[in-house]
């Protein structure tokens, strides 16, 4: 996935009201842009950190740009635009780059399922039946180690999705929790038990119920993203 237009570089002044960020562009222009991330963005929003943003040409838009990338304190690039994760996964699925999920005959997005009124990010159809996928975007790295973690904030919704996937797996339906790691320099993924122990517990229970837990790491550059390789998940 290449960015639709060249990204512009700047530095972060502050993030506030969840969806807003003030930045200063490389040319000294101060802008308020859209922050497309509802998480805590730990290690992605240090004051003064380098950021990259896409600028909109739509005159009807209230904000002139969207925050796309951050440089972490460890010098890694993180894609903070969580909407990119689903697009990146879909691109990889259609290209056959996720070997464990290859061979499907149809793909549907945002499919309702489960007793808790959830929506799967993707439903794939195979000659043998359906498969449901939940995608999570991972950008959290605590230190110099090459292990990323999820979530970066307590997520009741994420735990609900795991319960729904586990229920499918118990019925003999393939269910997948797929972590899209949009952080460079990562070699493995784990649940962030120190942030949300309930999520970590739900993930382990889902895996025991038969949910397939996969992680794929993206190559993150200022030109674009590419889901490059499978990463181990340390439960």
Curated annotation (Swiss-Prot):
<dbReference type="Pfam" id="PF03749">
    <property type="entry name" value="SfsA"/>
</dbReference>
<comment type="similarity">
    <text>Belongs to the SfsA family.</text>
</comment>
<dbReference type="InterPro" id="IPR041465">
    <property type="entry name" value="SfsA_N"/>
</dbReference>
<dbReference type="InterPro" id="IPR005224">
    <property type="entry name" value="SfsA"/>
</dbReference>
<dbReference type="InterPro" id="IPR040452">
    <property type="entry name" value="SfsA_C"/>
</dbReference>
<protein>
    <recommendedName>
        <fullName>Sugar fermentation stimulation protein homolog</fullName>
    </recommendedName>
</protein>
<dbReference type="GO" id="GO:0003677">
    <property type="term" value="F:DNA binding"/>
</dbReference>
<dbReference type="Pfam" id="PF17746">
    <property type="entry name" value="SfsA_N"/>
</dbReference>
